[in-house]
Regions:
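Non-catalytic signal-transmission and effector/linker regions of two-component phosphorelay proteins
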Residues: 1-5
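Acidic di-acidic motifs
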Residues: 8-10, 88
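Two-component/phosphorelay signaling modules centered on CheY-like receiver
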Residues: 11-33
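Short, well-ordered amphipathic alpha-helices
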Residues: 14-22, 41, 68-73
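Acidic, metal-coordinating helix/loop segments flanking the phosphotransfer/catalytic sites
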Residues: 18, 34-53
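Glycine-rich, flexible loop segments associated with nucleotide phosphate handling
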Residues: 30-35, 80-83
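CheY-like receiver
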Residues: 51-103
Length: 103
């Protein structure tokens, strides 16, 4: 079983993403871990927790989602975890290329 992390500081958005993921036909193949804080997610990653996929808001209250992705790639050397960014803001689009999110 693989794990998917959902990180958004807005509970309504996290809940909606989790609801959509939970309706997937292969739901029994993965577990969902939710985070309301980029810092808590980073602590989990630094502690060695592995996720197949991070669904990550760009504008978090305590941490920029782009920074979380950059630390995942550069500090932790994790190039295997897929990163899917969600945001209503377009100003970060060019920064995302450095983090290599899902195409």
């Amino acid at each position: 079983m693989y794990q998917i992390a959902v990180c958004d500081d807005e509970e309504a958005i996290r809940s909606q993403i989790i609801r959509v993921l939970s309706a997937h036909p292969s739901r029994e193949a993965f577990s969902i871990v939710e985070f309301s804080s980029g810092e808590v997610l980073l602590n989990s990653l630094r502690a060695g927790q592995a996720y197949l996929l991070l669904i990550l808001d760009i504008q978090l209250q305590d941490q920029n989602g782009v920074t979380v992705g950059r630390l995942l790639r550069e500090e932790l050397g994790d190039n295997a975890t897929q990163v899917l960014y969600i945001s209503a803001h377009t100003q970060y689009a060019m920064e995302l290329f450095d983090v290599r999110p899902i195409n």
